[in-house]
Structure formats: structure tokens, C-alpha cells
């Protein structure tokens, strides 16, 4: 058994009594109340999910296993000559809560290589889809097509003990994750690069191999590592993470759950916003004939968008109340690698004008930029101009966090999710509205 799986087993066995004790001895302790506004309003802030993989503080942003983004990037091992830690080490951190050693990272890299072969039928499925299908449709279809590979589904059918569900779930997670870079890059090259596919180079790490298969030179390998890590997890309540958790709670396996997760991510209020940001900026650039708008000109574009009833993509957040640290990390990368890029300058002018306008408009609870406001700029700069592909990059990253959560869901025996619904008439009655 790999050291990762062995460590995970120890962690799980140590953790289980904590969960059991909370339910048995403290099950009736209240975490909060639910208002009518929350019931109608998408369950905002209702404390009803548990995860130890990441925690989102409204002001500070995300912590992965207790570490802020700068701490995560600083503490995880890096290969010589690169700035960003490997995805392999990050997977170890999310699963176990520990910072891995360099040899732990190598062991996972070897595991990923051994598991990376994508079955031919997956490529056949992708080729059978209309070429103008959205790349998220392709990614989601490829993932669900692989459900027949599920070790969990086989183990369940064979009557595996509940306490061991996590083991085959872990196998599914690692198997799926190892294949995702190849599948994502295949979609890209098939759809946008005249179907010229670049085979994997198994000497490279997760991020490096992805950059290689995309056909984009250094430092895009670091962009890939940074991108997958930053997008991996944002606690459990966001649409993609929650969808993955919900579907898996029915004991649907990793493939079903991750495919559904991707479908949720594909919405314009969630993961599709990074493509929307670039589309919006391109629209402004067209109107400006390529010239960088002044702050006054940009203010007019922002107000025009708001007055036409649209949102400013890349701004606002359901939980965050400050600038997203994922935005900041990418901005620092831009300042280092592409300070003079026109689109980066556009994004900077936007940063100067949008928050004040959203405050003046008085609707958005958070006027600050989120992760999506900056991420497309970097992709565009490195030649990835087909912006409807950006959510696929988000999806590969998000699969890491959602998968780690699902492994722990099974380890701790989290049950089928089943909140209660009420009718409008019942809400009116609770509110004391007389008819
Ligand atoms: N531009 C214009 N209006 C905005 C806005 C924005 N960027 N962000 C919020 N608002 C509006 C909402 O549409 C809502 O209006 P109504 O009352 O007319 O419905 C009002 O402000 C209150 O919304 P909120 O409570 O501040 O935000 P929500 O929790 O409802 O929604 C989010 C959060 C992210 C969907 C929203 O801010 C938004 O639409 N942003 C633009 C899209 C985007 O960047 N999404 C990516 C989020 C990150 C991710 O998940 O990937």
C-alpha cells in the first residue's frame, strides 16, 4: 500500500471517534437558525455542511487544511527551477492535512503515472460529440463515460463493508485525477488545434505534463500548477463542491459525482465567469479599437453593463467580503511575468473602478474581485485564447478538492443528504401572514 494511503488510513481511524462523539453526545447542540430569507435565498450562510479540507473566511479568504494560499505555496515542496509547488504534493496535503516530503511527492507522481492511461472509448466518446459542443460538456461526458471503471461501484456490488467504502473511493479519486490532464488537453487540441494531439510525457509532473500536452512552453507549467491549486476547493457550499458532495451522498461513485460537479461549475454565476470576464473585456476592447480605456471610459462601460441588467463578471461573491486572495496570487504572477500586457492593464483599470461603482449601485454585498476576474488574462497571454476552455481548467483543479472531500465523506460515513422543503403557504403561515 502507498504511504499516502497508509497515512490516510491512520488519519481516518484517528478522526472517526471525533465525528461519532459529536453525533452521539452533542447531536442536539444548535449551530444556528434558518430564516425565511435564507430558505428562499439559496441557503446563504446556513451552517449545515461539514468539511475539514478547506475553510473560507469571508475576510481572509480560503485556507487549505489550515494554510492560507501564500502559506500553501510557500510550504509545499517544489521541483528545482520552478516557482509553484507540484499538484501531487497538494493532493497529499488535502487528503492528509500534512505537508508532504519530497519523496512523498515523488511517490504520488509515480502513482499518477501508473494510473494515467485513458481508455480508448473515452476518446471515442469525445470524438462522437459535435465538435461545437462546449468543452465542459466534453469533459463532463468523458468523466461519466468512465463510470464503468469505478472500483467503488464494483466493491459495493460485491458487498464491501461500510467502513471500507473510502478505500475504493480513494482508488477512484486517484485513477480519475491521473487521467484528467490528458483528457482536458485532448479536448483542447482536438477542438482548437486542428485535432493535432500531443501524447503525454510521463517524465513530467501533473502540471508540467498538462502544459506539454497543451503545447504551451514554460512558464505555463507553473501557470497550470498555480491554477489547479488555486481552484481546487472553496469549502463545501459552493455549487460545484456541493453538487459533488450531494451526488456522492447517494453513494453514486466518484465518476458520477465529479461529472455532476462539472455540470454545476459550468454555470455563468460560477466557473463560467472566467470565460465571461474575457468575453466582456474583449467587447470593451473592440469598442475601444484596442486602446486601453481611461478610468472615465471604463466607468461608462461598467455602468452600461449594469444598466442593461447584467452582472460585472469576476466581481462579487456569495461568501467573500474582501478581494479574493486567489485574485491577488494571480495578480502577483501577472506583475512578475506580464506586467505590460494590454489585457492585464484592462483588468487593472477595472479593479480601480468597479468596486466603487458596485458600492454606489448598492446591490452587491461584495464589490471586490473574485478568482475569475484575473485568471483568463494569464491564459490569454500564454496563447490560450479560446476562452470557453477556461472553465475546463477550473474543473480539473476543482476535481482535486471535490474528490478529497468525497474520500473523507465516505471515511466518516456522512449520510445521504436530505434537507426539508416547505411550501410558500407554510412560510406565510410561519410569518403570520393572514389570508
Ligand atoms: N455585478 C452586478 N451585480 C451584482 C454583482 C456583480 N458582479 N454581484 C452581485 N450583484 C447583485 C446580484 O445580482 C444581486 O442582485 P439582485 O438583488 O437584483 O438579484 C445583488 O447584487 C445581491 O447579490 P449578492 O448577495 O451580493 O451576491 P450573490 O451571493 O447572490 O451572488 C455571485 C454571488 C458571485 C453569483 C454574484 O456576485 C455575481 O453574479 N457575480 C458575477 C459573476 C461571477 O463573477 N461569478 C464567479 C464567482 C466565483 C466562482 O464561483 O467562480
Model regions: which residues?
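Hydrophobic alpha-helical bundle cores within soluble ligand-binding/oligomerization subdomains
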Residues: 2-435
Amino acid at each position: 500500500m502507498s504511504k499516502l494511503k497508509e497515512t490516510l488510513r491512520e488519519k481516518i481511524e484517528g478522526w472517526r471517534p471525533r465525528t461519532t462523539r459529536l453525533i452521539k453526545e452533542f447531536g442536539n447542540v444548535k449551530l444556528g437558525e434558518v430564516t425565511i430569507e435564507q430558505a428562499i435565498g439559496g441557503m446563504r450562510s446556513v451552517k449545515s455542511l461539514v468539511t475539514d479540507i478547506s475553510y473560507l473566511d469571508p475576510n481572509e479568504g480560503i485556507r487549505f487544511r489550515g494554510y492560507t494560499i501564500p502559506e500553501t505555496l510557500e510550504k509545499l515542496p517544489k521541483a528545482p527551477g520552478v516557482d509553484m509547488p507540484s499538484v501531487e504534493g497538494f493532493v497529499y496535503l488535502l487528503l492528509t492535512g500534512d505537508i508532504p516530503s519530497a519523496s512523498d511527492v515523488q511517490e504520488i507522481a509515480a502513482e499518477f503515472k501508473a494510473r494515467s492511461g485513458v481508455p480508448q472509448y473515452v476518446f471515442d466518446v469525445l470524438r462522437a460529440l459535435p465538435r461545437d459542443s462546449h468543452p465542459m460538456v466534453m469533459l463532463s461526458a468523458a468523466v461519466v463515460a468512465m463510470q464503468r471503471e469505478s472500483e467503488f461501484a464494483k466493491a459495493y456490488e460485491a458487498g464491501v463493508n461500510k467502513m471500507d467504502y473510502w478505500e475504493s473511493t480513494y482508488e477512484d479519486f486517484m485513477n480519475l485525477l491521473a487521467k484528467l490532464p490528458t483528457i482536458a488537453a485532448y479536448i483542447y487540441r482536438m477542438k482548437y488545434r486542428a485535432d493535432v494531439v500531443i501524447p503525454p510525457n510521463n517524465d513530467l509532473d501533473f502540471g508540467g505534463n498538462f502544459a506539454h500536452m497543451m503545447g504551451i512552453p514554460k512558464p505555463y507549467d507553473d501557470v497550470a500548477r498555480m491554477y489547479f491549486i488555486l481552484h481546487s476547493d472553496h469549502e463545501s457550499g459552493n455549487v460545484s463542491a456541493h453538487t459533488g458532495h450531494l451526488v456522492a451522498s447517494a453513494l453514486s461513485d466518484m465518476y458520477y459525482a465529479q461529472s455532476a460537479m462539472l455540470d454545476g461549475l459550468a454555470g455563468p454565476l460560477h466557473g463560467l465567469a472566467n470565460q465571461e470576464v474575457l468575453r466582456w473585456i474583449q467587447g470593451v476592447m473592440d469598442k475601444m479599437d484596442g486602446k486601453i480605456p481611461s478610468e472615465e471610459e471604463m466607468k461608462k462601460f461598467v455602468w452600461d453593463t449594469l444598466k442593461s441588467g447584467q452582472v460585472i463578471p469576476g466581481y462579487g461573491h456569495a461568501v467573500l467580503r474582501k478581494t479574493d486572495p486567489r485574485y491577488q496570487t494571480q495578480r502577483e504572477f501577472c506583475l512578475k511575468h506580464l506586467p505590460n500586457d494590454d489585457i492585464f492593464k484592462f483588468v487593472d483599470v477595472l479593479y480601480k473602478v468597479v468596486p466603487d461603482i458596485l458600492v454606489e449601485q448598492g446591490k452587491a454585498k461584495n464589490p471586490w474581485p473574485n478568482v475569475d476576474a484575473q485568471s483568463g488574462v494569464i491564459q490569454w497571454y500564454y496563447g490560450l485564447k479560446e476562452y470557453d476552455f477556461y472553465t475546463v481548467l477550473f474543473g480539473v483543479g476543482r476535481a482535486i478538492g471535490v474528490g478529497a472531500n468525497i474520500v473523507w465523506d465516505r471515511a466518516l460515513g456522512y449520510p445521504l443528504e436530505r434537507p426539508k422543503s416547505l411550501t410558500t403557504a407554510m412560510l406565510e403561515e410561519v410569518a403570520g401572514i393572514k389570508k
